[in-house]
């Protein structure tokens, strides 16, 4: 929680104003931020200076793991995070590759589970990583990559957190996640949860011990219409004790995650928080 608040304060105090062409808004921006999450000791990085809806973040991650490409499927899991980008993005609404209502195109999990090969067929990146780690293999390339410039025109949004690199030291699993862009007031509380949970769940299904998760953000920003709420409300609140995160121990394989797992298989204990803050969202 401390490192999250330090980043927010750094943006407010040291950020540069940048015009964002996609949203038509100005952003207060800093370059490069590094966050570390101690998964081994269950130090769950859930924001306490406002209420954080962690279940939606886990649901979104589960949708990526399953390779979903439709906002309706994400809603069924328990999150509406893709409704706007799938249905309110003018450029995507006029894109000939859009299949209809709720279609997201070839984004995130689609790339992770079905990366198109130039010579035909697809690569299931996640399956390969899970199989390797389960056998104790780390080829120094256990990388889940969502960033496919050749297919950007076939999806509603480029990936923000685009790379997850898993590494083994003995029987301890580590994760380095890289994010090109981060809406800090709205997106980062989701992204922190997802990086933490991804390492925790991958360690569990591959029979390894979780270590640390390292989260690099390249462009961290606060939109102009979010600044007052961050500076004058959230940053004036005292952080509270971190909660703990728990996963159903019966989840033992990638197939479990693909089939029967729901949000009921994850829970948080000891979450105390301040009141919610309604930050504006930019499509």
UniProtKB/Swiss-Prot annotation:
Coiled-coil features, chain-numbered ranges: none
Q: What class of enzyme is it?
A: transferase
Its cellular-component GO annotations read: cytosol
Q: Where in the cell is it found?
A: Cytoplasm
Q: Name one Pfam family in it.
A: Thymidylat_synt
Q: Describe which pathway this protein belongs to, using the record's wording.
A: Pyrimidine metabolism; dTTP biosynthesis
For the ligand ((6R)-5,10-methylene-5,6,7,8-tetrahydrofolate), the binding residues are 183, 282
Alphabetized UniProt keyword annotations: Cytoplasm, Methyltransferase, Nucleotide biosynthesis, Transferase
Positions annotated to bind dUMP: 22, 180-183, 191, 221-223
Q: Where is the active site?
A: 160
Which GO terms of the molecular function aspect are on file? thymidylate synthase activity
> Entry's HAMAP family?
Thymidy_synth_bact (MF_00008)
User: Can you state the subunit structure given in the record?
Assistant: Homodimer.
Q: Which family does it belong to?
A: Belongs to the thymidylate synthase family. Bacterial-type ThyA subfamily.
Q: Entry's NCBIfam families?
A: PRK01827.1-4, thym_sym
In Swiss-Prot or TrEMBL terms, this protein is called Thymidylate synthase
Its organism's taxonomic lineage begins at: Bacteria, Pseudomonadati, Pseudomonadota, Gammaproteobacteria, Vibrionales
């Amino acid at each position: 929680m401390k490192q999250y608040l330090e980043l927010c304060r750094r943006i407010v105090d040291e950020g540069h104003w940048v015009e964002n062409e996609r949203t038509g808004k100005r952003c207060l921006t800093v370059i490069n931020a590094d966050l570390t999450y101690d998964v081994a000791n269950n130090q769950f990085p859930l924001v306490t200076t406002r209420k954080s809806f962690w279940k939606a973040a886990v649901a979104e991650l589960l949708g990526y793991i399953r390779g979903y490409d439709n906002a309706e499927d994400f809603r069924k899991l328990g999150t509406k995070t893709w409704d706007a980008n799938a249905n309110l993005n003018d450029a995507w609404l006029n894109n000939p590759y859009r299949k209809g209502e709720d279609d997201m195109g070839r984004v995130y999990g689609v790339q992770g589970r079905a990366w198109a090969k130039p010579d035909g067929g697809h690569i299931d990146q996640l399956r390969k990583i899970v199989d390797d780690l389960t056998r104790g293999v780390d080829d120094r390339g256990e990388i889940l990559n969502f960033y496919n410039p050749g297919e950007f025109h076939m999806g509603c949004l480029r990936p923000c957190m685009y790379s997850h690199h898993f590494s083994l030291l003995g029987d301890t699993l580590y994760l380095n996640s890289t994010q090109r862009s981060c809406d800090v007031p709205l997106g980062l509380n989701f992204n922190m949860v997802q990086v933490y949970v991804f390492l925790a769940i991958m360690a569990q299904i591959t029979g390894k011990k979780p270590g640390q998760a390292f989260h690099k953000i390249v462009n961290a920003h606060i939109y102009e219409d979010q600044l007052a709420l961050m500076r004058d409300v959230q940053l004036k609140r005292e952080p509270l004790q971190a909660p703990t995160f728990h996963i159903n121990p019966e989840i033992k394989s990638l197939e479990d995650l693909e089939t029967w797992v729901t949000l009921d298989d994850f829970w948080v204990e000891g979450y105390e928080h301040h009141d919610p803050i309604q930050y504006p969202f930019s499509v």
